Amino acid sequence: MSASMPSVLIVILNYGTYDLTIKMIQEIQTKLEYDNYSIMVVDNCSPNESAEILEKQSKELGFLFYANKSNAGYAVGNNIGIRYGIENRYQYTWILNNDVELRDSNVLLHMVQKGESNKKIGCLGPKIYTLDGSACAPYCNRPTVWRMTLGIAQERKNRAKYIDTPREVYRVYGCCMLLKNEAMKVVDCMDERTFLYGEEDILAERLASKLYVTFYDSEVGVVHKESSSMKRMSKNRKQMQIRETNKSMELYLKEYRHYPWLIRKACMATRNLITLVR
């Protein structure tokens, strides 16, 4: 493998957890089977010493560092990296949470090869595992009112059938997604009106509106530690998740799906109930 492979900018968003970010970078540098990449860390105005520590480590570990002046959320932070990648002619941007482990060392190579095989692929994601070894089902279908309310249980069963099937899907998981920069330039990156949660659905709509597709690469995977801890969320964390999810869902359902007020509220109420009983 050589620099003839498409160039990839790996973007890691940091907020307070510089230790996880450094560990993630070290894992990439020692395990990832891909030569033509750079790493960029965006610190989202952490309330601790993260920015100072990461800026120092950037020189020692050889990664790009950007200190954001405010914590404007997931989309804004990652857009800094995506736009840097576009401006500096990287062909792909790999959005990677710092609480992810590389289950397969060829995960990036495999996704890039899939992306190169089809010009209309704008976004790819691998299989996502939890710490107990179980895999998260892909989001194959575009959400409908039925799938977001009364039919949500049946939709989950249907999704589980495709865990091991590489295919076009509606959207992938935001903890690990490979973005084709040509497509991101066309759709103007992520919608920065979200803060946390729901960005993947909105990105899926932006890509589809320009006739790009999203691909689920089930043949390679990563482990997402947060997926394993969702059931242990504190009451305050659940309240925060509900609040931010509602903001994102309102934007998604109103401006991207054009649903009326009553339907939007029904969809959000169903989502809130699921979060509370988890």
Stretches found by the model and what they are:
Residues 11, 205-278:
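Active-site-adjacent helix/loop segment of glycosyltransferases
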Residues 43-52, 70:
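A conserved acidic beta->alpha catalytic loop
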Residues 67-88:
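Glycine-rich, basic loop-to-helix element that forms the pyrophosphate-binding segment
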Residues 143-170:
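Short, flexible, basic/aromatic active-site loop/helix in glycosyltransferases
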Residues 89-101:
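Short beta-strand-to-loop acidic/aromatic patch adjacent to the donor-nucleotide binding site
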Residues 170-221:
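A short, conserved alpha-helix in the catalytic core of glycosyltransferases
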Residues 103-138:
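Conserved donor NDP-sugar-binding/catalytic core segment of glycosyltransferases
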Residues 17-31:
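Short, well-formed alpha-helical segments that are part of the catalytic scaffolds
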